[in-house]
Regions:
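Residues lining hydrophobic/aromatic ligand-binding pockets adjacent to catalytic sites
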Residues: 1-201
Length: 201
């Protein structure tokens, strides 16, 4: 399940005043949008930098979302572009994975990947960008809860970042931590759910 509450006011100072967050990051999925619609959506939220978290940043059906093409077009729109393959999805679950709460193999594999040194370095690059500019993490999937952005958002939230999922030109959705997430220092794991002795399951 995911929270469906929306935040209409996306004014940055107001959001920062709402709490003691380490910073704010947005997320967005390019989906099947035209390039013009995508740039308009970034502009509506005043996004100044885009961090591409696709592992394979190409699209045959939507070639304007290929990495090289995007980098040039975003520069023309005064938006900085950074591809971070270390944050990309399509990861395999590891033997002895501590993340058995995920029944989706792709999400379990990504949860395993999030404890790797490569992921940690990539996330710090994204955070560094977000400290300087109004930054969004981008993947292809429109719905954040069907994308590995949801796991990145969990970890950012655990580390005191505020995460806002862009849904449209006038609305974002504040991220809420997955109920299965458990802190291990600065990291998170999603251990298998415990079934009670007298449970009907």
């Amino acid at each position: 399940m995911h929270d469906t509450s929306l935040l209409i006011n996306t004014d940055l100072p107001a959001l920062q005043a709402a709490g003691d967050a380490a910073g704010i990051l947005w997320t967005i999925g390019h989906s099947t949008r035209t390039w013009e619609a995508f740039v308009a959506l970034l502009g509506a939220h005043r996004i100044e930098a885009l961090v591409d978290v696709r592992r394979f940043p190409g699209s045959r059906r939507y070639p304007w979302f290929a990495s090289d093409t995007m980098a040039q077009a975003l520069e023309a729109a005064s938006v900085r572009y950074l591809w971070l393959p270390a944050l990309g999805g399509r990861r395999k679950a590891q033997p002895g994975s501590p993340n058995g709460a995920w029944r989706n193999a792709a999400f379990q594999g990504y949860a395993d990947h999030m404890t790797s040194a490569d992921f940690g370095a990539g996330l710090e690059q994204a955070a560094a960008m977000a400290r300087e500019r109004r930054t969004a993490l981008m993947c292809a999937e429109a719905l954040w809860w069907q994308c590995h952005r949801r796991l990145i958002a969990d970890l950012l939230l655990h580390r005191r970042w505020q995460v806002l999922h862009i849904l449209g030109e006038t609305a974002v959705q504040p991220h809420q931590l997955n109920a299965d997430a458990r802190p291990v220092g600065r990291d998170l794991i999603y251990p298998p759910r415990q079934v009670g002795l007298f449970s009907a399951e």
